[in-house]
A protein has these predicted regions:
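Acidic, polar-rich low-complexity tracts and alpha-helical solenoid repeat scaffolds
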Residues: 1-320
Length: 320
């Protein structure tokens, strides 16, 4: 009879029935824990996640933290909620496992909480659990995955100090692939750039900027030229920009930014006519709706003012 109640997910009815039989009460007290768990587990293994979640929730509320199956019941409950896309409930259960040292589900639980929190833009929480995952990772691949998560959280939190630290740690990994290496270099370079550490940014940008067919590489090529410019090496900046114009890229935004920078270089050299020609050509050929056209207009106005000042100065000198 017990088996029938378990298989039909009516264990509560069975327990209620047996409580009406006095001689079974002692046996029931010791077996109710197992009955409740086994019934919920069966629903889970059959893929009946709504019934499993309900049964496991009842088990956890009634018997835990002292029940025989609390750890695995928490794991099954978390997975059931995850399958049902009830992510807040899933996070609650996975968090219990992630914070329970030494349990066999800790690594997976940390990963789930981190990923779900990241998707909710809760980057500080996500960072914490990615960090926990990196410390208990069972392989270098999983440790790298966790470190990439930490890096992206740091990036989203605009924490440049953390970006530099995490990226540097990630770059020490022996089994890191080229895509992940470039991401780490890119993020660290951007952090250095934001901190005006242009010399350090140059080192990280150089290998990424060799391939401008990616968005990352195209931006790196522009930033490389901009770093040289800020360091006063305008000839090197110009060389990088002219190199960029000869490379094939579909990321016209960063090429346009580079040409605007080239115009700035010409202005610094007092070559105003050439600077204006670069801007006018770009204005006629760049049609995307973004901040490039606004930047062009601003630069042209600045050049016009310089030209007017030069004319005024020339007239004044002639009158002397």
């Amino acid at each position: 009879m017990e088996q029938i109640y378990v298989e039909t997910n009516h264990v509560e009815d069975y327990i209620a029935y047996t409580k009406t039989i006095a001689r079974m009460n002692m046996q029931l007290a010791s077996s109710e824990d197992s009955l409740m768990y086994v019934t919920a587990e069966l629903q889970y293994l059959m893929g009946n996640y709504p019934q499993a979640a309900a049964g496991l929730s009842t088990y956890l509320a009634r018997f835990c933290p002292n029940g025989r199956y609390c750890t695995i019941a928490t794991y099954y409950a978390a997975n059931s909620y995850y399958q049902l896309k009830q992510y807040d409930n899933a996070i609650e259960q996975y968090s219990l496992l992630a914070d329970m040292n030494g349990n066999p589900y800790m690594e997976e639980a940390c990963m789930r909480v981190a990923e779900l929190s990241y998707d909710k833009a809760e980057y500080r929480t996500a960072y914490y659990y990615f960090q926990q995952m990196s410390q208990v990772a069972s392989s270098s691949a999983k440790r790298i995955t966790a470190q990439v998560g930490m890096l992206r959280c740091s990036q989203n939190m605009a924490d440049t100090t953390s970006v530099i630290a995490v990226a540097s740690k990630l770059l020490e990994e022996q089994q890191i692939d080229s895509v992940t290496r470039n991401e780490a270099l890119y993020c660290r370079a951007k952090a250095y750039w934001q901190g005006e550490q242009y010399g350090l940014a140059l080192v990280d940008l150089t290998p990424i900027a060799k391939e401008v067919r990616t968005q990352q590489g195209a931006e790196a090529k522009y930033l490389l030229a901009a770093c040289y410019y800020h360091l006063g090496a305008i000839d090197m900046a110009e060389q990088e920009i002219m190199s960029f114009t000869q490379m094939r890229t579909s990321h016209q935004y960063w090429l346009a930014k580079s040409l605007i920078l080239l115009s700035d270089i010409n202005v610094d050299r007092q070559e105003l006519f050439q600077a204006k020609q670069y801007l006018l050509a770009l204005q006629n050929n760049y049609h995307a709706q973004d901040d490039i056209q606004t930047a062009i207009e601003s630069k042209l106005q600045a050049i016009a003012q310089k030209e007017a000042q030069q004319t005024t100065d020339t007239t004044y000198i002639q009158q002397l």
